[in-house]
Each structure stands twice: as C-alpha cells, then as structure tokens.
Amino acid sequence: MSARPRVVLVGPPGSGKSTVAHALAGRWHLAERDTDADVEAVAGKPVADIFVEDGEPRFRELEHEAVRLALAEHDGVLALGGGAVLHPATQEALAAYRESGGVVVFLDVSLTHAAPRVGFNQSRPLLLGNPRAKWQALMTERRPVYEAVATVVVSTDGIGPAVVAERIEAALADRRTGEPAADGGAGEDRSEA
C-alpha cells in the first residue's frame, strides 16, 4: 500500500497551516511536510522570488507537482500552500485522497486574526499593495474551494496551534465514532458519510 498523509491542511495565508502541521506532527510523532517548502527546494529560491522571476503560472505548476508528490509519498501531516487548492488537478487529487479515507482540514480564519499572523509582508506576493483588501478578495475567491475540498472545517480564530491541533484530533475521533466531541468545539465535519 502506498503512503498517504494522516491529514492534509488547507486554508488561506495566516490560518496557521504550517504551525498547526508542526503541532500535530509533534503530538502524533509523525513527520510534517509543507508544499511551499517543497516548491522552494525544487526551484532553489523563495516563493516570493518564483512569483517575481518566473510568474504565478510557473509557481502553480511547481506547486501542483509538489502536492501530487506529497500526497503519494508522505505519510505524516501535510500543509498545502494557500492557493494550491485552486488548481483543478489538485482538487481532483484531494478528492481521490478523501475518497480513499483521507481527511482534508480547512483551517478557517477571519481577516482580523489572519492580519497579525501574516504581517502582510513581501514574502506573501499575492498580498502586496493593499494587503487587507487583497486578502479579503482571495478569501472571497477561495472560500468555496476550501469548503468543497474539506472533510472538516476548524476555525483558528483566537486560539493557538496546540488548541487547533486538539480540535482536529477531536474531529478525527468524531469521524471514527460518529459521535460529536464532548467539548463541542472540535470542528465541523463536512463528510457526506
């Protein structure tokens, strides 16, 4: 049987994908993987430089290939770049992963809570200019896609990565037992089962 991530995290910039992946990996004693880091390793330069020097289409090609490989090879916690879900082939790959029993968690966050985390700096090339307005526009475009690919939705507003990790664990337990978490804060299960 091929490797498959224990969980895949998706969400906008500032939702905490990388830090939550680290927290979950630590709790579960698993490896963590971030597809943005994979893209940077292949390209030999930071994401921001790829956007400037090679353009967004090239970045998206590299990103999709990184997601495809990670879904096939990685058996730990996988964090996808914020825009990875926009690629139709990535959506198909995530659907196949879910159909095989995989769990995709949409880490939802409001602009109020994302802003301090993101810092709206040069390392976020899609947010340059008026970063708050651009972030809001990204979410308007991406929210339906995040929701469509997700098995579970967990809000990260006002809580740290350890609490988010606990809520993800509770949501995964809910999926196994079919019972809601005792604390009621595990997250929303979006599976159709």
Model-predicted segments: where are they?
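Conserved lysine of the Walker
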Residues: 17
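P-loop (Walker A) phosphate-binding loop of NTP-binding proteins
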Residues: 12
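Hydrophobic anchor at the beta1->P-loop junction of P-loop NTPases
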Residues: 9
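ATP-dependent small-molecule kinase phosphotransfer cores
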Residues: 34-95, 124, 132, 136
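NTP-dependent small-molecule kinase module
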Residues: 1-3, 27, 103, 133, ...
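Short glycine-rich anion-binding loops that position phosphate/pyrophosphate groups of nucleotides
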Residues: 82-85, 110-112, 159
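A glycine- and Lys/Arg-enriched "phosphate-lid" helix/loop adjacent to the NTP-binding pocket
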Residues: 99-144
